[in-house]
Amino acid sequence: AMAGLTSQPAMNSIVAALQHSDRDTGIDPDKIQKISEYWRDVRPVYAGFESELVTSSAEIYKYEIPGGQYSNLKPQVESFGLGHKFEDVKNMYKTVNQMLGDIVKVTPSSKAVGDMAIFMVQNDLTPENIYEKAANMDFPDSIVSYFEGMMGQPHGGFPEKLQKLVLKDKKPITCRPGELLPPEDFDGI
């Protein structure tokens, strides 16, 4: 009752799918059904916190948008007055991810990809025209932080031309961001 939608599949589904196979979990489906029924009854209490997504969707695999971000992306897109372009933003998310080198998307890197996708749709940018049209634009803070190296160094490195466009005259770090923190004063705590 708490899974599905943009989350992982419900445990009941996994247990049932693996039953009578060499990967049978040995979990009693009737016992976990009781847990599901409990959460089915509790879930309405939290209805105010639910996203508008009320059905399961495999789009998260198509666009490679993490489930938690997917459920927050639509309200974020709407907050920019781009609700009518939500499909464009989802497609751009996949495009931006490829522009960045098909990065691992977890908070905060997934936010950087999403912010850049919204920015590009908002400004009618494409991978082809971004270098001339965006030369004098200020990019979202999250994407600047990403290219500065503050989210770490991506496997395969940064796409240099895009990094220079985003950072302008700023220099990226080349070490692990945590190495820049001062030592913790445990005696002073």
PLM segments and residue spans:
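Residues at structural and domain junctions
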Residues: L18-S21, T25, E59, S79, ...
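Functional cores that coordinate and move charged inorganic groups
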Residues: A1-V54
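Terminal or standalone catalytic/regulatory effector modules within metabolic enzymes
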Residues: V54-S57, E64, G68-I189
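A short, ordered amphipathic alpha-helix with a cationic face
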Residues: A3-L5, I60-E64
